[in-house]
Amino acid sequence: MTAFSFKKEDRLLKRYEFIEIFTSGKTVHSSCFLAGIKKNRKERIRLGITVSKKVGKAARRNRIKRHVREFFRLHRDNLSNCWDINVIAKKKAVNASPAELERSLAELFHKSSREFPSDRQ
């Protein structure tokens, strides 16, 4: 079992990492989110979160980011390793309830795991 923290090594930090995901990765959609996914050379899954100003003011954008981080933190063990994932919030995410956001994230990660099967047995 891994620790439930969201360490620096688990995050996408550099601009070129985000760009690389969308130039050479694949995308999956859910009702409130879009995700770019690309295989990495690390031994861990890494997450990036993008919420543009078009989605809402800072407090609303931060709330969405907190929900994404928390979902990732709790469900990281169920996801395949060696992937970079950038989750982008759609405008619909602002008005969604926490339950809707969680359902949408579950759908997104389910689609991504179907698209990219786990290396683990």
UniProtKB/Swiss-Prot annotation:
Gene3D superfamilies: 3.30.230.10. InterPro entries: Ribosomal_Su5_D2-typ_SF, Ribsml_uS5_D2-typ_fold_subgr, RNase_P, RNase_P_CS. The gene is rnpA. The keyword Ribosomal protein does not apply. It comes from Desulfosudis oleivorans (strain DSM 6200 / JCM 39069 / Hxd3) (Desulfococcus oleovorans). It catalyses: Endonucleolytic cleavage of RNA, removing 5'-extranucleotides from tRNA precursor. This is Ribonuclease P protein component. Belongs to the RnpA family. GO terms for cellular component: ribonuclease P complex. It is an enzyme of class 3 (hydrolase).
